[in-house]
Design a protein with these regions (language model features):
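Signal peptide processing junction and immediate N-terminal pro/mature segment
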Residues: 34-44
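A generic structured-segment signal
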Residues: 4, 33-34
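N-terminal secretory signal peptides
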Residues: 1-14, 39-41
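N-terminal export leaders
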Residues: 14-32
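N-terminal alpha/beta PP-like core and its mobile active-site loop of ThDP/TPP-dependent enzymes
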Residues: 24-27, 43-244
């Protein structure tokens, strides 16, 4: 399916052959028309230029979210998140909407996704994952797209049983999410941040969870290229037939 779409978008496959390929995969005639109609608009508009940057892990994470159109981040505060707040203070395009408790912040992100139809972003302390899970269950049942990020103890000294920390909060979060991951390499900060938003927002929607250890969030001198997400967005909504 992926190769078929790429050939069509790259104009190496005709509309007729692309439709025949979809039909061979089991798509109905109406589904074929909807997919072809959506892809026909995928390359409209100017292609935004990528951003080559160097900064902390948190600055890379924030720049990646902004490249995906994120302007609101919900969450609470904690010491382990301080590198991210430093990154927020250096810009004015994205705002942090704070709550006094993680369960409330989760409900705010859930409501934002339901009202706006956009993937919500939630950033909470790793020690507050149990509080987050209380209301994340509701978002999971509603199939609400929420990219949940959390901090964590440094991965350079694992197994120290840090204060109020569990070595692995991913396993309990797996029950109420589509996908969980811990970023242990600075080269994957942008990649996994993008993937979190993409997986959460891909139908059927649902929460995802990505954990960033403190040394990854605060890592200096991270070099990367941030690509605007609209360059890769392909509409997948079913288009109605005007004649019907």
């Amino acid at each position: 399916m992926r190769d078929l779409i790429k050939q069509f978008v790259d104009q190496r496959l005709s509309r007729r052959d692309f439709g025949a390929g979809l039909a061979a995969l089991g798509f109905s005639a109406s589904a074929v028309q909807s997919v072809v109609g959506s892809l026909a608009h995928a390359d409209e508009g100017p292609v935004a230029a990528p951003l080559r940057m160097e900064g902390t892990g948190s600055e890379v994470m924030l720049a990646t979210l902004q490249a995906g159109g994120v302007r609101n981040i919900f969450g609470t505060t904690a010491t382990g998140m301080s590198p991210f707040f430093d990154a927020l203070a250096l810009q004015s395009d994205t705002r942090m909407i704070l709550s006094i408790a993680e369960s409330q912040a989760t409900s705010m992100a859930h409501g934002y996704e339901l009202a706006s139809g956009e993937t919500a972003v939630l950033f909470v302390p790793g020690v507050a994952i149990p509080s987050t899970m209380n209301n994340l269950y509701n978002a999971w049942k509603d199939r609400s797209a929420i990219a949940v990020f959390s901090d964590g103890p440094s991965n350079q000294l694992p197994g120290r049983d840090a204060f109020q920390q569990m070595q692995d909060w991913l396993e309990p979060m797996d029950r109420f999410t589509k996908w969980v991951w811990q970023v242990d390499n600075t080269r994957q900060i942008g990649e996994m941040t993008r993937r979190a938003s993409q997986v959460a927002g891909t139908a059927p929607g649902g929460p995802v969870h990505v954990r960033f250890p403190l040394n990854i969030l605060g890592a200096p001198g991270v070099r990367t290229t941030v690509y605007p997400q609209q360059n890769f967005h392909v509409p997948v909504e079913m288009r109605p037939k005007p004649e019907l």
